[in-house]
Amino acid sequence: MNLLAFDTSTEVMSIGVSRVVDGVPRQWLHTSAGGAQASASLIATVMDLLQQAGLTLAQLDAICFGAGPGAFTGLRTACAVAQGLAFGADVPVLPVDTLLALAEEARHAALPEVPLCRVTALLDARMDEMYAATYDFADGQWSEVQGSHLVRPEDLVVARGAQAVQVLAGNVFTVYADRLASAEQNATTRITALPTAAALLRLAPGLLAAGKAVTAAEALPLYIRDKVAKTTAERMAEKAAAHAAAAQ
């Protein structure tokens, strides 16, 4: 399966391409500063990784992006680029919850041999709040226990499951250290992690098989807080993606 994935929902921009070469799965990955810088370099880096992998946009089975929740500008940039590239190449789009990608990254990095676990994924949402969601991992599959929502650190409730391993994962443990003490009492471990393109690439085959892909026109960011206006950078990223797809 030929896949392109990227996430710009946090302060880190993560991009990846995967394909099978001579029967062996291979990945090309890139990580750099995200935030406001993502719109300036995302498309160029995507095209460079595709070239390294020997793929064109039209040869992709899907374009995956971190749909949210996360930083507004990053979410809109990722969605606009995914739409622009997919429109020109007639490729389906796979929006993936960034908190699910975070949970998968934490599990894969720190608990690869653990067959059963419950992960509460947490991203700093600023304004004294966190984005949170809880997932169970069993039999190689993820299932949602509690969907993405906003919560104050001291109000976070970690629901205990039957799993022996209960994980808190995310980027909130320094900024909200004292205020997470109650939640951490119900966790067996905590893992500092962010959503990554590698996690998106691992999740994509199962999500595609489950029919989660959409057309470019149907792709949307997942907001927990409301925001309406597009920034100039977001509009420029959308146009640049369309031009890049048309040039191939």
Predicted regions and their residues:
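N-terminal beta-alpha supersecondary unit
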Residues: M1-A67
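Conserved hydrophobic/aromatic positions in well-ordered beta-strands
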Residues: L4, G16-S18, Y131-Y135, L222
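Surface "functional belts" at beta-alpha junctions
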Residues: V21-D22, Q37, P92-P195, V228-A229
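Residues at secondary-structure transition points
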Residues: A33-S41, F72, R76, A80, ...
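Phosphate-handling active-site elements
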Residues: Q51-Q59, A86-V96, E113-V114
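DPxDG-like acidic metal-binding loop motif
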Residues: C64-P92, T98
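Acyltransferase
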Residues: R190-Q248
